[in-house]
Amino acid sequence: EVRVENFRATVPSSKSKLEFTGVGEGGISTCDLILDLRGGTPLFSAHEKRDGYFRPDPANPGAVAEALFTLSDMTGEFEKPRYVDYDAGICAHSSSRITGCTKCLDVCPTGAIEPNGDKVKYDPYICAGCGLCAVVCPTGAAKYSLPAGDSLSDRLRAVLGTYTKAGGETPVLLVHDDTFGRDIIALSARHGRGLPGHVLPFTVNQATQVGLDTVLHALALGAVQVAILLPPSKRADRDTLLAEFEIIDTITDGLGYGKGRVVLIEPDEPDQLEAALYVDALGAMPTGDVVGMGRKRSILRLGLDTLHRNAPIQPEEIALPAGAPFGKVEIDTEGCTLCLACVGACPTGALKDNENMPQLSFAEDSCVQCGLCKNTCPEKVISLEPRLSFRDEARSHQVVKEEEPFLCIRCGKPFATHASLNHLTQKLSGHAMFQGGDRLDRIKMCDDCRVVQMTVNDDNPLAHGTVPIPRTTDDYLREREELRAKAKQDMKDKGITDGEA
């Protein structure tokens, strides 16, 4: 839907140029195709990614003609694929209006994603299918749906497995799209040296859809390097990919494989592509048969475990850069009151309580470093530490803090924790409603006993004074007569008569 200012109808008899009639008014047009010849600010952000929006340079007749011919061929009905499958159940965007992860909102170039309560909402008609949201999503709530299911992982296993069984060594996986990437590889094969023998082309829908899970899976299958061939139309997205590749470099370097296992190639000509590929191959990687099934976190863990198991160096943990989807939650147990607000906010179940006693436990393998627990904590005792742990205890919940339940001082029923009651008592000790008597002790009673104590105790902080009896005219007249009688009696006692001065 496009709103147009000064909208006027054209004169059918216009000859040398278009003429318009009537008075300019606001108009609304619902259309599938837009040809923008204003030469000014585009109507949309990331306009080059919008389907059906053409914005050629009005000073270039050739570009305008090409756009017109392209538009004239766009007749009939078209199907637009849904590029992203979104699972709101594991989204870490926010909880109780407290914001956590905003990665997909930050990287979407077209504005197809917007907040929707505690979750986000995708507009499939605006989405251009770049896949960046799925790349940065820490939980896998956003999953790229082309290809569907686990077919991408199956293709990786088939390509690298077949190459290895045939005796191939040091395979380099060249990831490219089906347009620019395919064409530049074809030009290199026809007019240049083509691809080196150990470079395996791997076609995907968009080169920008490849993230941590795909790269680590390929390395675990034996690829010595993953090269992403980025077309010119995607150069604006390079920073997002480089941030993800920094995490991979940190992991592979920490395991002894060295850096540079994933690279970004941005050629404009076939010669530049060949120059980037005809280099000395990196050292061999261990070959494993990793079946990439399930969502993102499962594939990541399978790939990481394989790489760690066969690594030259096998550290127990690796420090990661900020923003990594792995890490630990540091909790100051002295300041923690076991209110368990963090448990309710955690979208992945990394933080868990115990229904039988006041207890907080944490599973590092499930943590995505979204920050919801940190932002929700009322005591501000939680901090995040991005790291990758290979310890066995990281895979299960470990107790962070536990206490024996506090018993009601009146009936003995367990109803709270010592830490929370001590904190509450300290906060309310100076409050006027809890001064004197046993008012402060009511905090240490369960809900039932607290009501009973306030009912039977005369020291009620909410009680008001005695209500005065309303006075009437008769009351005032009676008081007047009583005062007169008293005055006469006083005069009589003093020996004063009514006639004396």
Regions found by a protein language model. Name each.
Residues 1-107, 111, 170-183, 202, ...:
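Ferredoxin-type iron-sulfur electron-transfer modules and their immediate structural context
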Residues 50-53, 188-192, 240-246, 463:
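Short secondary-structure boundary/capping segments
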Residues 66-71, 89, 132-217, 221-222, ...:
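Flanking helices and flexible, charged tails adjoining ferredoxin-like Fe-S electron-transfer domains
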Residues 90, 121-126, 204, 232-237, ...:
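Conserved short loop/turn motifs at secondary-structure junctions
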Residues 107-140, 341, 345-348, 357-376:
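Basic (Lys/Arg-enriched) interaction patch that binds polyanionic ligands
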Residues 116-157, 235-245, 261-266:
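Terminal amphipathic helices with adjacent charged low-complexity linkers/tails
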Residues 119-130, 331-336, 359-369, 397-398, ...:
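Flexible gly/pro/ser-rich segments immediately N-terminal to CXXCH heme-c attachment motifs
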Residues 214-222, 226-264, 269:
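Cofactor-cradling patches in redox/metallo enzymes
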